From Swiss-Prot:
The gene is CYP15C1. The lineage of its organism: Eukaryota, Metazoa, Ecdysozoa, Arthropoda, Hexapoda. This is Farnesoate epoxidase. Residues 1-24 form the signal peptide. It comes from Bombyx mori (Silk moth). The enzyme is specifically found in lepidoptera (moths and butterflies) and is specific for farnesoate. Other insects contain the methyl farnesoate epoxidase, which is specific for methyl farnesoate. The keyword Membrane does not apply. Its EC number is 1.14.14.128.
Length: 493
């Protein structure tokens, strides 16, 4: 009798699930009752080490719109420049998923810059951009902020010159300092132990799950039965530690707040909370915005910068050309400036090629359909999570030799930068990453400061570092070491 009841329940769930998907839902592997395609994902993960490769494999079989059912949630994977552009530019697809994994970090609500939508997102984005610009974001002050941190990083590498250095965590505090001067009016020593621990927490967080959200999104009830197995316990511990740190920073600002004289973004937020009558932010808003800036700003740029050094050290001819351009345009007697960027086309091409071949945001940040909507020849139901296959876009046949690191693909015959519309590592449309300008500036300054002063090489008897990424919210490089050798004619700063 019990077996019959269970069977009826499963059948009922399956029928409801099929009805919710609709007859015009994009094709994909057949889902099972309750778990949907999750078991298929687990099976395929034995073959493919990264989730974006699973989606790519299925898309090749089912088409540019891949329809999945993961647990109780519809998920559509979008492949191809035209469909990606359409999803990115249509208002109906501007939503962000409301899965448990995305909201557990923001007090069960859709707050902040990354995972909010609708009026909350528009309000928060407007506030944050206004505050950041007021304190120097995208202004001449960024030359100073980024330059200071690059000089500190160079000095640290000069102190251990000739020694093999694990580079995977090298940029974390540097990146935090650049943004945190605007956000919290604070900078840290590059050897600050507490911030190193917080950076390690963010690294762990980004490796726990891919951008789809995993079992915590699709079968969230499992956290009550096997919390450690599905990563809930570790995620909760990490978020608790990060929120505790942010609460301390905000409390310190509250205690020293001077109305009418904000010193940084947090001060401006707090003053707005006190003085605004309508549509004012809350402490929860502020805390999640700080979390977004800390996590996304740190980990994605760090991973890209590490991949950038990886490709340079693997390709000696690329390193030689970078040294030559730096010597010709900047020389050795002054530090690089952001103003140099417009003339340094080969350096820019190396950055673009890194963003292409090592697309750390392999599926972008998920979108969600705010209403039923037609896409291609199919209907995307309201509430569907939408993943944009950026990694596949950057590794498709358009590039002819996509697995080869070749910066020259971004140079015209005349030696100018070629802007290829197929390269969209920061997304497009209204939900395009607001930190794109800062990220590109940081990558330029990191590369020029380091290559002006050092020749990079792999330690003796160690293999070339692998270009194969580690899966996660942001793809990251496997651990590798570099020796930073001061260039022979380098003059100390």
């Amino acid at each position: 009798m019990l077996a019959l009841i269970v069977l009826c329940f499963i059948l009922f769930f399956y029928i409801i699930s099929r009805r919710h998907r609709g007859l015009c839902y994009p094709p994909g592997p057949t889902p099972l009752p309750i778990v949907g395609n999750l078991l298929s994902v687990l099976w395929e993960s034995r073959k493919f080490k990264c989730h974006h490769l699973i989606w790519q494999s299925w898309s090749q079989k089912y088409g540019n719109l891949l329809g999945l059912r993961l647990g109780s949630i519809n998920v559509v994977v979008v492949t191809g420049i035209e469909l990606i552009r359409e999803v990115s530019n249509r208002e109906v697809f501007e939503g962000r998923p409301d899965g448990f994994f995305y909201t557990m970090r923001s007090f069960g609500k859709k707050l902040g810059l990354v995972f909010s939508d609708g009026p909350t997102w528009h309000r928060t984005r407007r506030f944050v951009l206004k505050y950041l610009k007021n304190f120097g974001y995208n202004s001449r002050f960024m030359n100073v902020y980024i330059g200071d941190e690059c000089e500190a990083l160079v000095q640290l590498r000069l102190a251990d010159a000739g020694e093999p250095i694990l580079v995977n965590q090298m940029f974390h505090i540097t990146i935090v300092n650049i943004l945190w001067r605007l956000v919290a009016g604070k900078r840290y020593d590059l050897e600050d132990q507490r911030l190193k621990e917080l950076c390690s927490l963010v690294m762990r967080l980004f490796k726990l799950v891919d951008m789809s959200g995993g079992f915590l999104n699709f079968l969230p009830f499992l956290r009550h039965f096997v919390p450690r197995l599905i990563g809930f316990t570790e995620l909760q511990e990490i978020h608790n530690a990060l929120h505790q740190y942010l609460r301390e920073i905000i409390k310190e600002h509250q205690e020293n707040l001077q109305l009418g004289a904000p010193k940084d973004v947090i001060d401006a937020f707090l003053i707005d909370m006190l003085e605004s009558q309508d549509d004012k932010p809350t402490l929860d808003d502020l805390q999640v915005v700080c979390l977004d800036l800390l996590e996304a700003g740190m980990e994605t740029v760090t991973n890209t910068a590490v991949f950038m050094l990886l490709h340079v050290v693997r390709n000696e001819d690329v390193q030689r050309k970078l040294h030559q351009e730096i010597d010709d345009i900047i020389g050795r007697d002054r530090n690089p400036l952001l103003d140099d960027r417009i003339r340094m086309v080969y350096t820019e091409a190396v950055i673009l090629e890194t963003l292409r071949i090592s697309t750390v945001a392999s599926m972008g940040i998920p979108h969600m359909a705010l209403n039923d909507a037609k896409l291609g020849n199919y209907i995307i139901p309201k509430g569907t999570f939408i993943l944009l296959s950026l990694y596949e876009l950057h590794h498709g046949p358009h590039w002819k030799d996509p697995e080869t690191f070749r910066p020259e693909r971004f140079l015209t015959k005349e030696g100018n930068i070629l802007q290829d519309e197929w390269l969209i590592p920061f997304g497009i449309g209204k939900r395009r990453c607001i930190g794109e300008g800062l990220a590109r500036s940081e990558l330029f300054m990191f590369l020029t400061h380091i290559l002006q002063k050092f020749h990079l090489r792999i330690p003796k008897n160690e293999p070339l570092p692998s270009t194969e990424p580690i899966d996660g919210l942001s793809l990251s490089a496997k651990q590798f070491r570099i020796i930073f050798e001061p260039r022979k004619t380098f003059k100390s700063i």
